[in-house]
């Protein structure tokens, strides 16, 4: 099953003096802003301060994670880090979210295979599960292990359930595979 497909991921962290995302009570309270504008490649902006006030040392600053979905070795992935950071700042300026003088510092992280894709041979993944479920001491978990779009909480629950199976000598891994199967949770394309 070498043909399972993934999207890769680049996140640029930018520490800012200000950002044009305010409500009457200060910065907006959203954790993520999904970007749909066709003239930029940004997929999502995470406002790290909103996850926890302890995530940013200087309470007068805003730290954002600007996210890009890409493929390893494509145009975005292949950019030099300094060029990519400049590109990201330029995109944030195109969105009228920041000005050059707002930027204090930045960093970049690239993650291969961050997002499992439900394309290609994904419809044959059950063969992997059937094979690996027979290996008593092997428990698949997380996005890459299960080739499933699990969030951190789902991955942690899978790990806890795997530990429970081990501790109780339970060979049935169904409880692990049932994590993140709630239909109301998933984002699906609606038919109009």
Segments the model singles out, each with a brief description of its role:
Residues 63, 68-69, 88-94, 98-102, ...:
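A short, terminal or domain-edge coil/loop segment
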Residues 71-73, 113-114, 145-147:
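Short Gly/Pro-enriched loop/turn and capping motifs at secondary-structure junctions
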Residues 109, 118-192:
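C-terminal lid/capping helical subdomain adjacent to the catalytic/cofactor pocket in oxidative enzymes
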Residues 2-3, 20-23, 52, 78, ...:
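Generic serine detector
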Residues 1-82, 86-97, 174-184:
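Mid-domain catalytic core of redox enzymes
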Residues 7-9, 27-30, 39-54, 100-134, ...:
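FAD/FMN-dependent oxidoreductases across multiple families
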């Amino acid at each position: 099953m070498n043909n399972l497909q993934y999207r890769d991921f680049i996140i640029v962290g930018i520490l800012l003096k200000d950002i044009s995302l305010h409500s009457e009570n200060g910065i907006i309270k959203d954790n993520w802003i999904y970007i749909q504008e066709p003239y930029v490649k940004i997929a999502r902006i995470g406002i790290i301060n909103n996850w926890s006030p302890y995530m940013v040392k200087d309470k007068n600053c805003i730290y954002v994670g600007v996210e890009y979905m890409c493929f390893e070795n494509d145009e975005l992935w292949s950019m030099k880090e300094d060029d990519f950071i400049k590109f990201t700042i330029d995109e944030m300026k195109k969105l009228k979210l920041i000005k050059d003088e707002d930027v204090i510092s930045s960093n970049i992280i690239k993650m291969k295979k961050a997002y499992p894709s439900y394309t290609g041979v994904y419809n044959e993944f059950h063969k992997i599960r059937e094979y690996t479920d027979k290996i008593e001491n092997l428990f698949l978990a997380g996005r890459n292990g299960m080739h499933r779009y699990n969030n951190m909480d789902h991955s942690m629950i899978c790990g806890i359930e795997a530990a429970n199976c081990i501790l109780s000598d339970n060979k049935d891994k169904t409880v692990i595979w049932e994590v993140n199967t709630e239909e109301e949770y998933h984002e699906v394309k609606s038919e109009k």
